[in-house]
Amino acid sequence: MNQSLLSQFGTSEERVKRAIEAFKRGNGVLVLDDEDRENEGDLIFPAETITVEQMAKLIRYGSGIVCLCITDELCQQLDLSPMVQNNTSINQTAFTVSIEAAQGVSTGVSAQDRVTTIQAAIADNAKPQDLSRPGHVFPLRAKKGGVLARRGHTEAAVDLASWAGHKPAGVICEITNDDGSMARTPEIVEFGKKFNYPVVTIEDLVRYASNK
């Protein structure tokens, strides 16, 4: 990871603390994973507080695949089965079946509809019948143990939400460049400065979690 670029966002510990503070306020955070993994940056918001405006930003600047990162317990509560029985994904990304709110949405694609779906999924007494399948929100099952168990954006989202005092759920989307290519560290740093988002790495989060 290009530490010289990241140093403008503080030390590793400072970057994590700023990310947690942003989450506490319901703001977004940019999370970079390892260069030898996906080498991508995701914009992540706490699911509990995500707004239509924030969702619109994810859709506009991201890949369009908006994912809801949740715990295994919530997946079981909602009866969300894996998207496939045999996961051959290189990074073992744990997609479940996609979802839509059973009520209060039209086509399910708009920013408002996706926020409605997320709110339905993470509601305190959410039930399987509160969701239709398939839909336009893609749940991801976080590994128990968070980033210490798997160095993924999924686990980063759930950990950040928990550390900030929110429900353990986050909304993520990979940031793309204007030409459709994936944004790497230099572009993510510029994006963070432009929109005033903290930038943190998975390695930062692992270090922080190890010392908790």
From Swiss-Prot:
Coiled coil stretches, renumbered: none
Keyword Lyase: yes
Enzyme class of the recorded protein, top EC level: lyase
InterPro entries reported in the protein's UniProt record: DHBP_synth_RibB-like_a/b_dom, DHBP_synthase_RibB
Chain positions recorded as Mg(2+) 1 binding sites: 38
Known pathway: Cofactor biosynthesis; riboflavin biosynthesis; 2-hydroxy-3-oxobutyl phosphate from D-ribulose 5-phosphate: step 1/1
Domain of life: Bacteria
Entry note: cofactor: Binds 2 divalent metal cations per subunit. Magnesium or manganese.
Single GO cellular component term: cytosol
Site-annotated residues for Essential for catalytic activity: 136, 174
Binding annotation for Mg(2+) 2: 38, 153
Cross-referenced Pfam families: DHBP_synthase
Family matches, as SUPFAM superfamilies: YrdC/RibB
Protein task: Catalyzes the conversion of D-ribulose 5-phosphate to formate and 3,4-dihydroxy-2-butanone 4-phosphate.
PANTHER family assigned to the protein according to its UniProt record, in alphabetical order: 3,4-DIHYDROXY-2-BUTANONE 4-PHOSPHATE SYNTHASE (PTHR21327:SF38), GTP CYCLOHYDROLASE II-RELATED (PTHR21327)
NCBIfam families named in the record: ribB
Name recorded for this polypeptide: 3,4-dihydroxy-2-butanone 4-phosphate synthase
Organism in which the protein naturally occurs: Histophilus somni (strain 129Pt)
